[in-house]
A protein has these predicted regions:
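Alpha-helical transmembrane segments of multi-pass membrane proteins
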Residues: 21-32, 234, 452
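Start-transfer (signal-anchor) and selected internal transmembrane alpha helices
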Residues: 1-24, 90, 113-127, 266-300, ...
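Short hydrophobic/aromatic helix or loop-helix immediately within or flanking a transmembrane segment
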Residues: 44-47, 52-78, 82-86, 93, ...
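Extracytoplasmic catalytic/substrate-binding loops of multi-pass membrane glycan-assembly enzymes
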Residues: 29-41, 51-63, 78, 319-321, ...
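Membrane-interface alpha helices of multi-pass inner-membrane proteins
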Residues: 44-47, 129-131, 179-191
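ER/secretory pathway lumenal C-terminal domains and tails of membrane proteins involved
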Residues: 80, 85, 100-108, 139, ...
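Alpha-helical transmembrane segments
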Residues: 11-24, 126-132, 181, 224-231, ...
Length: 937
């Protein structure tokens, strides 16, 4: 077969694999948003909003294009998920072409005629490797939801195929165009995910092997070192450096020359592009000219971040971190809101802050960083609000892996440490190999190519989330008799067994590649560095702590992609070995067919736990939180984590559910940008009742205030001796929340910047309470008129005993509670953990998936039954559960429910149980039976 005919067959087979993958992923996509970050990404794509740092502007732009095809708001998420399905199929397409190109170059010289056996081996190896990756656990999971990892995988596959394609034209005048295009794609990939940068070592190695006549180990090491330097320069110099220099220009043009905001940044970008273009025309030497072209195209791709800056200035409903100027954008890009882990040297969990003398005292030594600028729109200038500071620690360690002081006991359980002191280097390395490498990488790797025990997140226990082969002898030796596990685990849909066949085929592929002489060794090094950089190198960089909130296998999809190349090579190696024994074409074809059965077997195992069709749980459960709220009064609901916030945002932003309500994420409520956004109206709801000025909630101001109960007696004495003066200074009631905040906590006077009591109060507007529809305690529900009004307490009292400080979030919650005046309903999602030491639960009444703040201490009034600390409004709960809530298609036979979905199902199931129990307690057995029957459905 000549080259042109083979090329047609290769193209046809590649597109066939693309169609297979697109069909599989299209059939199994989730028809709406999935849990974790997906609802946020979909909302950001639909309205070009600003998501969490460091953002994904290019993904947003492409996603926004696809959302234009949605027939109505409920279909927006389906279009974004379908985009991911197509991108994932595109990744499979380029994987196929990469495998066939690599295998062909090992079998024949370029453009040499091929035998039928050669064609079977080449195309068959591409099919085996590509389909094995198609049906692998991690990649399929990302392919059917609206996250960035499918796009990142597509770009990884694209640039790897491009550098292989460049080899065909490397010696022509057109060859450099492929290198320049790769630079552009890498620039665009910065606007999707930084994982794509990790392809650079493989790209540089291909370039080295192709362009240099004399290949040596020293040269290969130099190429790898150069590629590592390129990654460091792009990641730690180019990306933040562009923002740094843009900031210098901005300060010059705005603060010194008096131009409007953003002028300096625009001038800097104009100068940058001018210099690059001028350099391209000035320097014609091929190496310099190509380098300038690559820098230009990298910069053009990187400028997708202008979308973040533009949309942040538009103050979109989702505008996380509000990066509306170059200084905020730099912080956004650097992910400064997240805790950073040491890489090569740093503290351990036992490290203590370093102290330095200051006068008669010692203070914590701080490392001072750069200034933090904020735009002052009244003055038209940037102002320094503070300098960045970092605590200096003693007892630092080389290659510190056990660094988080909140995880000391978990570190010890993984490292074998028992003495409670600082970790030794042996324990440090034990933790690194046992947890970070073995448990958080190799376990995921083996999930994909050996088998998976179940889809329950594991934390080291033998019954959850381990890898298994499906061969009882091997599995029982490692994990105990698997037949003794509960049926729920044995029948778990995430139980996938591949009998280690994909792994064995991949190992054969590595061996075959290694044995193919010089060219094979070169290929092996290229694929190995793609495998290493997108897998083990990420493990080194992330430095993860134990107890991750979810499994992290999605971060290593690129590494599994590289191993899929070796799986394809393994099929080629087996067939090539059979051919050398002078077997017929039929025998080789039959063996390749048997190899193809491996991905078929993988599909038979993984289909049931990757088919998300007909599953609407994330959308409906998010809507249920909002539907818990009353229809009037512009209610407010406090949320906290990803899965009790992002689905709510998605419902409100994208599908228009309950735009009269406000969602307040308490994990953001300590930040100045979020407080400002919450003060502003949104859709049909007014801002939150927060009266603080920008100066009062600015970053670094009023982060916490000390509680000084010993001052209470002095204040009471002042009110006794000088009542008029006291009232003028501290209000009529000095311990009422509004007065505490006004005269004490937010005071500019340092001596008054305290909470002078351990018991604070909030006044109760009794008429407002009666109008609000809040459930009244049983003991006063029968009263009427003035008797009822008089029975309502005048104040509620909140104890601060055993507390040393109030945080900014605490103070904001107290102010909102006081300012809502029982007219604007205030709720706390039931999934919110302990975000505050304030004890409100006695004042809670449960109406569904949220607790309502009330002025009644139901425990004292006798409404709290059993072990609960809160009351239950049976009528509202019944209405919500039976009539207002939707349940995401849970009644669909065979619907796949993963662990995250099941966890949210448990919240709903608990509601049914609580409601039935309360109805039975009230003697309403008829409705209790209806509730239980509905739950069973």
């Amino acid at each position: 077969m000549n080259y042109l005919l083979f090329k047609r067959w290769n193209d046809f087979s590649g597109w066939l694999v693309f169609l297979i993958a697109a069909f599989v992923y299209g059939m199994t996509i989730e028809p709406t948003a999935s849990f974790w970050d997906c609802p946020e990404f979909i909302s950001c794509a639909e309205k070009l909003q600003v998501g969490h740092p460091p953002g994904a502007p290019f993904y947003m732009l492409v996603g926004n294009l696809f959302t234009q095809f949605a027939s109505d708001p409920s279909q927006v998420s389906r279009t974004v998920n379908f985009l991911n399905a197509l991108l994932s199929a595109g990744c499979i397409l380029f994987l196929f072409w990469s495998i066939t190109r690599l295998v062909r170059s090992l079998l024949k010289e370029e453009k040499e005629n091929l035998s039928v056996t050669d064609v079977i081996i080449i195309l068959g190896s591409g099919l085996v490797g590509a389909l094995a990756y198609t049906f692998s656990d991690t990649f399929w999971f990302s392919a059917v939801e609206g996250e960035v990892y499918a796009f990142s995988s597509f770009l990884t596959a694209l640039v790897f195929w491009m550098i292989l394609r460049w080899q065909d034209e490397s010696d022509t005048v057109y060859g450099d165009r492929w290198i320049i295009l790769i630079a552009y794609i890498i620039g665009l990939s910065i606007g999707v995910h930084l994982l794509n940068l990790l392809c650079i070592p493989a790209i540089v190695l291909v370039f080295y092997y192709q362009k240099y006549q004399t290949i040596s180990l020293k040269g290969a090491i130099a190429a790898i070192a150069l590629s590592g330097l390129l990654i460091v320069l792009i990641l730690f110099v180019y990306i933040p450096g562009m923002a740094d220099i843009g900031g210098w220009f901005e300060l010059l043009f705005v603060n010194v020359l008096g131009f409007p905001f953003q002028t300096g940044l625009i001038v800097f970008l104009a100068i940058t592009f001018f210099l690059l273009i001028a350099g391209i025309y000035r320097f014609k030497k091929r190496l310099i000219n190509t380098a300038l072209w690559c820098t230009l195209m990298l910069t053009v791709g990187y400028t997708t971040y202008a979308v973040i800056l533009i949309r942040a200035n538009a103050n979109t409903p989702l505008n996380e971190n509000a990066p509306d100027n170059i200084f905020a954008l730099k912080s956004y890009l650097n992910r400064e809101q997240y805790e950073s882990a040491p890489l090569l040297y740093g503290k351990t969990y036992a490290s203590e802050p370093e102290y330095v003398p200051e006068g008669d005292y010692y203070k914590v030594k701080m490392k001072t960083g750069g200034a933090v600028y904020r735009p002052n729109k009244e003055e038209g200038k940037y102002k320094v609000i503070r300098n960045k500071e970092e605590v200096c620690y003693t007892q630092n360690m080389l290659f510190s892996r056990m660094w988080n002081d909140r995880m000391a006991s978990s570190y010890k359980s993984w490292s074998g440490g028992t003495d409670g002191g600082a970790p030794t280097q042996k324990e440090n390395l034990t933790y690194f190999f046992t947890y970070q490498l073995n448990y958080m990488y190799w376990r995921y790797f083996l999930w994909n190519f050996v088998g998976r025990q179940n889809d329950i997140q594991g934390h080291g226990e033998p019954e959850h989330g381990n890898w298994i082969t499906g061969i009882p002898l091997l599995d029982n030796l490692r994990l105990g008799d698997q037949e003794l596990l509960p049926e729920s685990l044995r029948q778990n849909k995430g139980h996938n067994v591949f009998y280690a066949l994909p792994l064995l085929l991949g190992l054969i592929g590595i061996y075959w590649q290694w044995m193919r002489g010089k060219k094979g060794m070169q290929q092996l090094s290229v694929v190995f560095f793609l495998f290493f950089m997108t897998g083990l190198a990420i493990v080194l960089y992330l430095n993860q702590t134990p107890g991750q909130p979810r499994e992290r296998d999605y971060a290593y999809a690129g590494s599994f992609y590289a191993f899929a190349i070796w799986i394809g090579m393994g099929a080629a190696g087996l067939c090539d070995a059979l051919r050398k024994k002078k077997s017929s074409v039929l025998h080789v074809g039959l063996l390749m067919f048997l190899c193809l059965l491996i991905p078929v077997q993988m599909a038979s195992q993984t289909w049931d736990d990757h088919d998300r069709s007909n599953r609407f749980t994330c959308r409906d459960f998010g809507a249920n939180y909002l539907m818990t709220l009353p229809d009037k009064g512009n209610p407010i609901i406090f949320s906290n984590g990803d899965n009790d916030t992002f689905p709510l945002w998605y419902n409100q932003d994208t599908e228009g559910v309950r735009r009269d309500a406000r969602i307040c994420n308490l994990s953001y409520a300590q930040t100045d940008w979020y407080i400002y956004q919450q003060q502003c109206p949104l859709y049909d709801a007014p801002g939150l009742p927060i009266t603080w000025s920008k100066d009062q909630y600015q970053e670094g101001k009023n982060e916490y205030v000390a509680i000084r109960p010993e001052l209470k007696k002095q204040i009471e004495e002042l009110y006794q001796k000088h009542p008029e003066e006291a009232r003028d200074s501290f209000g009529n009631d000095p311990f009422e929340v509004k007065n505490i905040l006004k005269y004490w906590a937010l005071s500019e006077k340092q001596d008054f910047h305290v909470i002078p009591t351990d018991t604070i109060s909030i006044s109760i507007d009794k008429d407002a309470v009666l109008r609000s529809g809040i459930m009244l305690p049983d003991s006063i529900r029968h009263l009427k008129g003035e008797d009822l009004k008089n029975a309502i307490p005048d104040k509620i009292y909140i104890s601060l005993k055993d507390m040393r400080i109030l945080t900014k979030v605490d103070m904001l919650m107290l102010e909102m509670l006081a300012n809502c005046n029982w007219e604007r309903p205030l709720y706390m999602a039931i999934s919110v953990g302990e975000v505050s030491k304030l004890k409100f639960d006695h004042y809670f009444v449960q109406e569904g998936l949220a607790f309502r703040f009330t002025p009644f201490d139901y425990k004292k009034w006798g409404n709290v039954k059993g072990d609960n600390n809160y009351a239950i409004d049976v009528e509202r709960l019944y209405e919500n559960v039976m009539n207002r809530y939707k349940y995401g298609g849970l009644d669909t036979p065979g619907l796949y429910l993963d662990e995250t979905t099941l966890r949210t199902c448990y919240y709903h199931r608990r509601l049914f149980a609580q409601l039935a129990k309360e109805l039975i307690r009230q003697g309403d057995n008829t409705r209790a039976r209806k509730v239980l029957a509905y739950a069973e459905q």
